[in-house]
Amino acid sequence: MVNPSVSRLRTGGVEELTVTGRRSGQPRRVPVIPVQVGTHRYLVAPFGESGWVQNLRAAGEGQLHGHGQPEHFVAHEIAVDQRAEVIDGYRKIAGRSVERCFRSLPDPGDHPVFEIESRLDAAAG
């Protein structure tokens, strides 16, 4: 089931995040917009401390379904002082659909950001 407030993010680059629910143990799906900054990819939480954020923190891994095969990844939350550049890149990609979120919650600390690393990359590193 997709969160209706997040479904408004349907723009180019939207992928479906699947992460195990921290309480239910069941797969939870939500649309996200991965953003690349340099050679790293990230997931940004425009709505703040949402369910998918808490689930991803607990699980430490998930899957992205977008173009072709699902991508299994590990996730590492980045420190607040490292979020600004990633959030700026995200806002450019996501556009007006998320601007209200960032006006309401302007502090980068209100928007968890996870660096995602493909399981294949993680195994090699």
Q: Which residues does each PLM region occupy?
A:
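Short, small/hydrophobic-residue-rich motifs at membrane-helix boundaries and re-entrant hairpins
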Residues: M1-T11
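Short beta-strand segments
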Residues: G12-P46
